[in-house]
Structures are given as C-alpha cells and as structure tokens.
Swiss-Prot record:
<dbReference type="InterPro" id="IPR023576">
    <property type="entry name" value="UbiE/COQ5_MeTrFase_CS"/>
</dbReference>
<dbReference type="Pfam" id="PF01209">
    <property type="entry name" value="Ubie_methyltran"/>
</dbReference>
<keyword id="KW-0949">S-adenosyl-L-methionine</keyword>
<dbReference type="GO" id="GO:0032259">
    <property type="term" value="P:methylation"/>
</dbReference>
<keyword id="KW-0489">Methyltransferase</keyword>
<feature type="binding site">
    <location>
        <begin position="122"/>
        <end position="123"/>
    </location>
    <ligand>
        <name>S-adenosyl-L-methionine</name>
    </ligand>
</feature>
<comment type="pathway">
    <text>Quinol/quinone metabolism; menaquinone biosynthesis; menaquinol from 1,4-dihydroxy-2-naphthoate: step 2/2.</text>
</comment>
<comment type="similarity">
    <text>Belongs to the class I-like SAM-binding methyltransferase superfamily. MenG/UbiE family.</text>
</comment>
<feature type="binding site">
    <location>
        <position position="73"/>
    </location>
    <ligand>
        <name>S-adenosyl-L-methionine</name>
    </ligand>
</feature>
<dbReference type="GO" id="GO:0043770">
    <property type="term" value="F:demethylmenaquinone methyltransferase activity"/>
</dbReference>
<keyword id="KW-0474">Menaquinone biosynthesis</keyword>
<dbReference type="InterPro" id="IPR029063">
    <property type="entry name" value="SAM-dependent_MTases_sf"/>
</dbReference>
<comment type="function">
    <text>Methyltransferase required for the conversion of demethylmenaquinol (DMKH2) to menaquinol (MKH2) and the conversion of 2-polyprenyl-6-methoxy-1,4-benzoquinol (DDMQH2) to 2-polyprenyl-3-methyl-6-methoxy-1,4-benzoquinol (DMQH2).</text>
</comment>
<protein>
    <recommendedName>
        <fullName>Ubiquinone/menaquinone biosynthesis C-methyltransferase UbiE</fullName>
        <ecNumber>2.1.1.163</ecNumber>
        <ecNumber>2.1.1.201</ecNumber>
    </recommendedName>
</protein>
<feature type="binding site">
    <location>
        <position position="94"/>
    </location>
    <ligand>
        <name>S-adenosyl-L-methionine</name>
    </ligand>
</feature>
<keyword id="KW-0831">Ubiquinone biosynthesis</keyword>
<dbReference type="GO" id="GO:0009060">
    <property type="term" value="P:aerobic respiration"/>
</dbReference>
Length: 250
C-alpha cells in the first residue's frame, strides 16, 4: 500500500511516505528516557487509570498469548503478564529500539521476565504467524503508524479466531466545551512541559499535532471493521480525550 501513496502527515506537516517512519523514530528515540515521567506529568497520572480499565475489559485469562503492540515502556505488558500467569505469554513489540530497551530494563528491574518476550517489529508487517494471539493491545501507538490500514490488517492476520483487538488512543473530546480547552492545553502547555522536563519542545509539539490528526472515534471504528474485525465498539474515557476501541475476530 505504501508505494501507492506519495505523502502523508507528520503532525501538521506533509512528508514523503517513507520519511514519516524515520521522523517518528527520531521522536521516540529522543523521548524514551523521559517517557514515563512525561506521561505522568502530562496526564496528571490519569493514563494509569485508562490502562487499568483496558486490562479490566480485556478478560485475558491464564495460559493465553497476548501481543502488546507499541508496548513502549511496558505499562500494559506488566498488567497483562499478571493476567496470563506463568502458563501464558505476553510479547512486548515495538518498532523503536530505544523504547523497547526502556520497557525491557524497567520490567526486568521489577522481576518480570518469566512470561514476557521482547520483539522489535513494525506494526504494518508483524513478524508473527497467522492466528497467534488471543488478545492484541495497542496503547497510544496507532496514531504514529504510517499506514494505519496496513497495520490493522496485520493485527487481524495474527489475531486468533475468537480473539480480541483493543486500541487505546487519544481521540476527539465529546463533552461540550472540552475540545477548545483540550486544544489549548495540548498546543500551549504540552510542548512547554516537554521543554522544561526533557529539553525537547519539538517532540511534544509533534505529540499535540499527531493527536489532532488522528481519526475520530467513528472513523477509527470503520477502519477496524473494514479489515475484518467485527462487533467493534468504543468507550470514551475522560470525555473522549481518549477512546478505547474493542473488536473481535470470528
């Protein structure tokens, strides 16, 4: 699909199709060491609640195989590893080596290693066999993917029949009056926090822009259904600032 499209967006900028992946990699290489601290500051810690809610609705059971895609620093992987137990397995996959190392080191420091594997891989061409996973989670990663349709197709391929996809991502506020306040915070406060804490204003400017450019709830629902997933629905969290999409492969 990529060779059919000449340009895409990197935040608000139009870039060559093959350039976006490189630019996103540079962003996450830059933010990796401060990723957890910045998440806590930017969301006032609420991102932990969003992630716990995702795990609660996953209904993952002992012995199952789970893919935590764009798993980054390992928040979802940690919780999932507790659910699947020693008889199951969680694969933390991320395209970015720096983020993967942060997640691996963090989880190893917490003594979590028996049921976790780490794989560097691209969501658009996942290096796993067909029908491999009972559940696939992707937390705050889809908006950074160059070809979202191709990535969703790849997720569908590796999901087991009867399995579940869960996409947790920034979305479009639905409460009246919330969107302008959220936009003001995103474009005026987030980059300044990035500059102060991580000395990296540009990466957090991209974060704000990438959120604005990401498909809204209904558009993403249609994209997920288009690749073959069924019974797709979503939960608006914090007034739609974040949405959790859940869908099934039958």
């Amino acid at each position: 699909m990529a060779n059919q499209k000449q340009t895409t967006h990197f935040g608000f900028k139009s870039v060559d199709w093959n350039e976006k992946e490189k630019k996103v990699a540079e962003v996450f290489h830059s933010v990796a060491k401060n990723y957890d601290r910045m998440n806590d500051l930017m969301s006032l810690g609420i991102h932990h609640l969003w992630k716990r809610y995702t795990i609660e609705l996953s209904h993952v059971r002992p012995g199952q195989s789970v893919l935590d895609l764009a798993g980054g620093s390992g928040d979802l992987t940690r919780l999932l590893s507790q659910k699947v137990g020693n008889s199951g397995q969680v694969i933390l996959a991320d395209i970015n080596a720096a983020m993967l190392h942060v997640g691996r080191d963090r989880l190893l420091d917490e003594g979590l290693f028996k049921n976790i594997r780490y794989v560097q891989g691209n969501a658009q061409c996942l290096p796993f066999a067909d029908n491999s996973f009972h559940c696939i989670t992707m937390g705050f990663g889809l908006r950074n993917v160059t070809d979202k349709d191709e990535a969703l197709q790849s997720m569908y391929r590796v999901c087991k029949p009867g399995g579940k996809l869960m996409v947790l991502e920034f979305s479009t506020p639905v409460f009246p009056g919330l969107k302008p306040v959220y936009d003001w915070y995103s474009f005026n406060i987030l980059p300044k926090i990035g500059k102060f804490v991580a000395n990296d204003e540009a990466s957090y400017q991209y974060l704000a822009e990438s959120i604005r450019m990401h498909p809204d709830q209904e558009t993403l629902k249609a994209m997920i259904e288009r690749v073959g997933f069924e019974d797709c629905h979503y939960h608006n969290l914090s007034g739609g600032i974040v949405a959790l999409h859940i869908a099934y492969k039958y």
